[in-house]
Amino acid sequence: MAVENIVWPRYLDASITRSDGRRVSLQDAIEDPEVDEIAEAVQQIGYDAVIEHDVAHPREWGTSGRVIVKGADDSSKNDLVQAVAAYIHLLRE
């Protein structure tokens, strides 16, 4: 069975606290992460990414979108989110 992980922008957002859903350290967090750059990072890491723009995180009122990562059964979700954050930092340099 194929593994699907969901990466919400708030997992990487520097303005969100850990208790509100950020999953990376503040040092690794991204200012205003976009689903398009998350999807690009996921693809560069080597997984398939599907963007859903019209979906809101259950804790958020606004629509922020999400990225569905397919085929990431060789790593934990935490490792995946950390790798995405690191790659977005490289993209923004």
Swiss-Prot record:
Localization (cell): Cytoplasm
Biological process terms in GO annotation: SRP-dependent cotranslational protein targeting to membrane, signal sequence recognition
GO molecular function: 7S RNA binding
GO annotations of cellular component type: signal recognition particle
Pfam families reported in the protein's UniProt record: SRP19
InterPro entries listed in its UniProt record: Signal_recog_particle_SRP19, SRP19, SRP19-like_sf, SRP19_arc-type
Domain of life of the native organism: Archaea
Gene3D superfamilies reported for this sequence: Signal recognition particle, SRP19-like subunit
Keyword RNA-binding set for record: yes
Keyword terms: Cytoplasm, Ribonucleoprotein, RNA-binding, Signal recognition particle
Transmembrane segments: none
Function: Involved in targeting and insertion of nascent membrane proteins into the cytoplasmic membrane. Binds directly to 7S RNA and mediates binding of the 54 kDa subunit of the SRP.
Similarity comment: Belongs to the SRP19 family.
Subunit structure: Part of the signal recognition particle protein translocation system, which is composed of SRP and FtsY. Archaeal SRP consists of a 7S RNA molecule of 300 nucleotides and two protein subunits: SRP54 and SRP19.
Protein name (database record): Signal recognition particle 19 kDa protein
Species of the source: Haloquadratum walsbyi (strain DSM 16790 / HBSQ001)
